[in-house]
From Swiss-Prot:
Residues 46-418 form the PIPK domain. It comes from the Eukaryota. GO terms for cellular component: endoplasmic reticulum; plasma membrane. It comes from Xenopus laevis. This is Phosphatidylinositol 5-phosphate 4-kinase type-2 gamma. SMART domains: PIPKc.
Length: 419
């Protein structure tokens, strides 16, 4: 396709099917607004060109997939497939999109199938990622970590090695999800992409947010079942929501209060998932635990309402789902249902959430799931294990152990987090 007027020149290749584009590239730019509102014309406005390219690419990718029939079954080639597009952008929306960029969608049919299995409609997925710009939650040595504007999706920057590891485990992961009928604590992988801007490649994986898009998390733990070097640093502890670790959990005498049936269901899922990770020789994963305090949240909401009334203006962040602001997107499901009260959640959306038991000291909601599952027990880990054994002694509780030992120790630790 050649460039004419305000249209970008596009060349597209796909390992499965090649179809038309241009649903997102045919109109004028709208005036910039502060609030999260739907842009009738998709201009993919973001402060970072990379995020604009991600929004553009996801929009294009989903529009293409909608035109391709859903296969009766996935074939081995689908787990190696990709769809690529190269865009030369002269005039259209040039204040937001780079003049040249490339977008690659890995295994589109596989992730489409996973989204369907996890109860996420493709168009809701598209809206949640493209209606308004995602915002940066944190940035560290592991890359950026973003949330979709409606807080239902996590967008994580990963390495090319992570992409290779995902390709190795993807068919096993898919098989596991099918086998357990989507009843899992593993991350829900929903899409994986490569963005190329200014001759630099960035790799992105999209997952369901383990925390609620609606209920605030007041305490957060990353638990591995290891006690060596597993305490949050002083620098971490002064953050508004620090990521606390195993030693912090024990030192604070923290407990998770759920009834016996919920505990049994949770541990069944966890054991099944950990067995799967051990079989693939994966390790270094963590249990992410988020705690929502219901009474504290009610107090905070009252204070916010008082502030809002005093200022008589809307907050720049829309609490999607709480007040029914989005007719679409993943959180849009809530709008056809009655409003949720304090500490209530919709299990279809907050799939990792568990309510505290009636005999808990205070009313809480827990969000628990497995994260960082891509570390393979390779030569690097073996070397690290040898070094740590020399430093701490053979019997020390160190995190770098064989996958079998890691899984066993992890399950033992998590069993004991419950009251």
């Amino acid at each position: 396709m050649s460039s004419s007027g305000a249209m970008p020149a596009v060349s597209s290749t796909s390992s499965s099917a090649a179809v038309g584009i241009l649903s997102a590239t045919t109109a004028k730019t709208k005036t910039k607004k502060k609030h999260f509102v739907q842009q009738k014309v998709k201009v993919f406005r973001a402060s970072d060109p990379l995020i604009s390219v991600l929004m553009w690419g996801v929009n294009h990718s989903v529009n293409e997939l909608i035109q391709v029939p859903v296969p009766v079954m996935l074939l081995p080639d689908d787990f190696k497939a990709n769809s690529k597009i190269k865009v030369t952008n002269h005039l259209f929306n040039r204040e937001n999109l780079p003049s040249h960029f490339k977008f690659k969608d890995y295994c589109p049919q596989v992730f489409r199938n996973l989204r369907e299995r996890f109860g996420i409609d493709d168009q809701d997925f598209q809206v949640s990622l493209t209606r308004s710009s995602p915002y940066c939650e944190s940035e560290g040595h592991d890359g950026r970590f973003l949330l979709s504007y409606d807080k239902t999706l996590v967008i994580k920057e990963i390495s090319s090695e992570d992409v290779a590891d995902m390709h190795i485990i993807l068919s096993h992961y898919h098989q596991h999800i099918v086998k357990c009928h989507e009843s899992t604590l593993l991350p829900q992988f929903l899409g994986m992409y490569r963005l190329s801007v200014d001759n630099e490649d960035s790799y992105i994986i999209v997952m369901r947010n383990m925390f609620s898009h609606r209920l605030t998390v007041h305490r957060k733990y990353d638990l591995k079942g290891s006690l060596v070097s597993r305490e949050a640093s002083d620098k971490e502890k002064v953050k508004e929501l620090p990521t606390l670790k195993d030693m912090d959990f024990l030192n604070k005498s923290q407990k998770v209060y759920v009834d016996e049936e919920q505990k049994r269901n949770f541990m069944e899922k966890l054991k099944r998932d950990v067995d799967f990770l051990v079989q693939l020789k994966l390790m270094d994963y963590s249990l992410l635990l988020g705690i929502h305090e219901v009474f504290r949240a009610e107090q905070e909401e009252e204070e916010e309402l008082e502030e809002d009334n005093a200022e008589n203006e809307c907050s720049p962040h829309v609490n999607v789902g709480s007040y029914g602001t989005s007719p679409e997107g993943i959180a849009g499901y809530l709008n056809s249902h009655k409003p949720l009260g304090p500490g209530e959640f919709e299990p279809i959306i907050d799939v990792y959430a568990i309510k505290s038991s009636d005999n808990a000291p205070q009313k809480e909601v827990y969000f628990m799931g497995l994260i960082d599952i891509l570390t393979h027990y390779d030569a690097k880990k073996k070397a690290a294990h040898a070094a740590k054994t020399v430093k701490h002694g053979a019997g020390a509780e160190i995190s770098t152990v064989h996958p079998d030992q890691y899984g066993k120790r992890f399950l033992e630790f998590v069993t004991n987090i419950f009251a």
